[in-house]
Amino acid sequence: MSPPPLLQPLLLLLPLLNVEPSGATLIRIPLHRVQPGRRILNLLRGWREPAELPKLGAPSPGDKPIFVPLSNYRDVQYFGEIGLGTPPQNFTVAFDTGSSNLWVPSRRCHFFSVPCWLHHRFDPKASSSFQANGTKFAIQYGTGRVDGILSEDKLTIGGIKGASVIFGEALWEPSLVFAFAHFDGILGLGFPILSVEGVRPPMDVLVEQGLLDKPVFSFYLNRDPEEPDGGELVLGGSDPAHYIPPLTFVPVTVPAYWQIHMERVKVGPGLTLCAKGCAAILDTGTSLITGPTEEIRALHAAIGGIPLLAGEYIILCSEIPKLPAVSFLLGGVWFNLTAHDYVIQTTRNGVRLCLSGFQALDVPPPAGPFWILGDVFLGTYVAVFDRGDMKSSARVGLARARTRGADLGWGETAQAQFPG
């Protein structure tokens, strides 16, 4: 099938954009949006919310990028659906670039593990392909701990079936934080070094078993409140219908988290932060943009942020059109956020509120300090995460996200793109 007329000129430019077409048609799955409250969102550190999704599709050849549906949690949380076992038992999971393990609640969970009883649970007896492992694991997240045992079974994701993965059956989730989560578990997309018990991350397994062409994935997070869907996660490449080229590639400096070097941050014409350069992590598991306390305090002073409890800042909604842009210098290119990008508008008890998309987070040396570019940034810019291979190092590609329906007809057939 030939590409749409509007896409043909773009494909001619691919050699200049440092990408290459695969000739494969991209697979899409419809997504849905829901809107719970933000206080829970803060507790969850940006984990994603589930939705009713269609059954997972038929198997796809390894040379096709695979789309996994994401659903939006109050504009800054996204999640999708996977299947485990034979036949597949479906779970909603947060796709997290800041961790590397896959886990879901277990039917064998502890009686007093409240979060377990409020979510879908994996039943090993209901799967004909289940293989016991039994190794104990424990994962500590920013907002809670998960304990359980490792097991092995078949993974279904975005149409791919048959991947044999080792995953965690969560037996004990002592933190009530996960009780508030509208997702069941977490699928980590970080580097192997972050993986607990040396388990191969799901992305690595898909590549090693020939079900995925390259260890590359990209996120398009749709933050348009008028749209019912939350965007798409593309496994194996990226889709030019999601972004305005070119992609700017920035090398990963610490291959654990998706950490890169950020040259500067500017707030309007007058304030410069990260003046001597600093570390930044792109993290789909973080809702907001975080940075060192002193710099975030200065940023809020420049945009008129009024401090509230729990580190939140409120913005006067009437001032949004007058607020300065906040710009991030990455790979020699400025990535600008307007106030409409970084102010989160919500309604509480019938009252319209405007909340800042920036929050302070101090991480001491040697790991920190660093900024985290979470979903407020990733909702404006598509990110292509390229793990690299023996010939190339890991890197992240960034480009402005297209407005749904603009520039390319949304839903038209497009050609996949892979970082070169």
Curated annotation (Swiss-Prot):
Where does the sequence pass through the membrane? none
Q: In which tissues is it expressed?
A: Expressed predominantly in adult lung (type II pneumocytes) and kidney and in fetal lung. Low levels in adult spleen and very low levels in peripheral blood leukocytes.
Q: Could you tell me which SUPFAM superfamilies the record lists for this protein?
A: Acid proteases
Domain named Peptidase A1 is located at 78-399
Q: Which InterPro entries match?
A: Aspartic_peptidase_A1, Aspartic_peptidase_AS, PEPTIDASE_A1, Peptidase_aspartic_dom_sf
EC identifiers of the protein: 3.4.23.-
- GO CC entries: alveolar lamellar body; extracellular exosome; extracellular space; lysosome; multivesicular body lumen
Q: Which Cys pairs are S-S linked? A: 109-116, 274-278, 317-354
Please provide the record's keywords in A-Z order: Aspartyl protease, Disulfide bond, Glycoprotein, Hydrolase, Protease, Secreted, Signal, Zymogen
Mainly resides where? Answer: secreted
Where located? Secreted
Question: Per its record, what are the GO molecular function terms?
Answer: aspartic-type endopeptidase activity; endopeptidase activity; peptidase activity
PROSITE patterns annotated for this entry? ASP_PROTEASE, PEPTIDASE_A1
What residues make up the propeptide removed on maturation? 26-63
- Sites carrying a glycan are 90, 133, 336
Tell me the enzyme class: hydrolase
Active site at: 96, 283
Q: Where is the signal peptide?
A: 1-25
- In its keyword annotation, does this UniProt entry include Signal? yes
Q: Name one GO biological process term.
A: proteolysis
Give the family from UniProt: Belongs to the peptidase A1 family.
Q: What does this protein do?
A: May be involved in processing of pneumocyte surfactant precursors.
State what protein this is by name: Napsin-A
Recorded source organism is Homo sapiens (Human)
Q: By which gene is this protein encoded? A: NAPSA
